[in-house]
Amino acid sequence: MNQTAPEQLTIWTFDWVPEGPRGYVRDLRLRWACEEAGLSYRVGSVPFEDRGAEHRAMQPFGQVPYLTDGDVSLFESGACLLHLSEKSETLMPRERALRAETLSWVLAALNSVEMVSVPWWFVGLSSPPENPLEGWLRARLTVLEDVLTARDWLVDDRFTAADLIMADVLRPPWIRAIGDYPATEAYINRICARPAFAKAHADQIAHFSRADETREA
């Protein structure tokens, strides 16, 4: 495990992953948040193929990302995102009602949408004649389509952490291919066109590409 000075804000990810998940590993959410908020950070890495005790001391499930911020450490991308959001009004409004709405939508992305979309995807990998979760996912996407038909952003007519996490949950092409949701598609495209997303995405791809070179050397 790479070590870092304790005062640095550090996003921890794997040292390498196969091609498939690149661009979707969830440290991207934290890189993106830092880029949006203008927060200085570094990226540390832990072994993908040897998830030892030191890693599990920081992330009990042996996953990524986790975040260290001085003497504070957090795991789970949602918890880390909320911690970063408290550092910037760009991500988290300070007015109480808007803050509450942002928190609600962040958790909706993780609990009401991603909790359905990820199991739906895993079931689909086995190519069943009919995915039993598809109706559930379509119902959630229909709710979002109605919301996003009425407004451009989830909270306060501007980008917040709620949009960051919702767009990241929705952007995988296998989710976007499930049906015709034009307002949602426009929303994802608009958010993923932001320079902060482009940089975070490119940086993650570059991180794993450099690891390929090391493995091949």
Predicted regions span which residues?
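Residue-level detector of family-conserved "landmark" positions at structurally sensitive sites
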Residues: 44, 77, 183, 201-202
